[in-house]
Regions:
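Short, acidic/polar linear motifs in exposed loop/turn regions
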Residues: 90-93, 241, 266-269
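Short Pro-Gly-centered flexible turn/kink motifs
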Residues: 1, 45, 86, 224-240
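Short, Lys/Arg- and Gly-enriched loop/turn segments at beta-strand edges
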Residues: 239-250
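Acidic, contiguous internal or C-terminal segments within carbohydrate-active enzymes
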Residues: 1, 58-109, 234-235, 257
């Protein structure tokens, strides 16, 4: 099953810089939010990353800032991860700024949950506690009554994501916080206006949400490159099916727990895995040697 939105038919919305936005899969926002390239044909080449993997390389050059961007998307055999590498370069003799946010388009359901561990959330000039605001858990889609977004402040881990129990699907994004600090979600809301906006984009019967990862903590900040400077970052998307809300995730595993049980799902093939579960006192509660397969 698709974990990202794929509307049918595709109906561009007039909310982009050039007046055309589609809620489809992943959007690489550069050099600003909902970038000018979304509905434009882009230079694209296939390349061989080695070891049986397949790769696509996309290049975007911004005429205003002069910053050159390359996005590499890689799929590797024996795993269910989508790898992306971003390379930003400033070839000009002056300092220039840009933003980068990876934007995943998601079909929204009432119980869909934003999986994030943060101290606070930020919206324009307003800071709120997180995850509870006025007694409501704002991570859960049904509690976002109108169009709104939230940026995680002081996120505590290298991963975040989402999961929908209604669709039994979700995903986590994994990247080093030293490279990518931003963790954000946006919802059109589940009121009449929000559902109407989703229908206009070809998503019928559900709402629409976005889960975004950025270089900086909010979209009010720009990263700057000195003359000849460059910036490289790596990120991974890990799809989840029939799993639940994630408690922890890496590029190898995702973990969820409920009273009396732990569940583990793998992103890669493991022929002979030696696993141990320990308690808070360090005592080993259970050990097992098993084979794991993606999913």
């Amino acid at each position: 099953r698709e974990v990202f939105a794929r509307p049918d038919p595709i109906l561009p919305m007039p909310i982009l810089l050039r007046g055309a936005f589609i809620p489809l899969g992943l959007e690489f926002n550069f050099p600003c939010g909902h970038s000018v390239f979304a509905m434009e044909s882009m230079p694209c080449t296939f390349f061989d990353p080695g070891s049986g993997a397949a790769g696509i390389r996309i290049r975007a050059w911004n005429a205003v800032s002069g910053i050159d961007t390359t996005v590499e998307i890689v799929l590797r055999p024996g795993e269910r991860l989508l790898h992306t590498r971003l390379h930003f370069e400033n070839p000009l003799p002056v300092r220039n700024g840009f933003m980068y946010w990876a934007n995943s388009a998601v079909t929204q359901t009432p119980e869909m949950t934003f999986l994030c561990k943060a101290r606070m959330s930020h919206f324009f000039t307003e800071y709120n506690t997180f995850p509870f605001v006025d007694g409501l858990d704002v991570r859960v889609a049904k509690n976002r009554h109108f169009a709104s977004d939230a940026f995680a402040v002081d996120a505590q881990q290298d991963w975040f994501g989402f999961y929908s129990p209604e669709l039994r699907a979700g995903a986590v994004h994994i990247a080093s916080r030293s490279q990518m600090r931003g963790q954000k979600f946006f919802s059109w809301g589940l009121d009449e206006y929000g559902m109407g906006q989703a229908r206009k984009m070809g998503i019928d019967g559900h709402g629409y949400m976005e889960f975004q990862a950025g270089i900086l903590e909010t979209q009010f900040e720009f990263h700057h490159l000195d003359p000849g400077g460059e910036y490289v970052c790596d990120e991974v998307w890990f799809p989840l099916h029939d799993f639940g809300n994630v408690s922890h995730a890496t590029e190898e595993f995702a973990l969820t727990h409920e009273p009396g049980a732990l569940r583990l799902t793998s992103a890669r093939e493991w022929a002979d895995l030696d696993a141990a579960v320990t308690g808070t006192d360090g005592a080993v509660a259970h050990t097992a040697i098993t084979a794991l397969h993606p999913g």
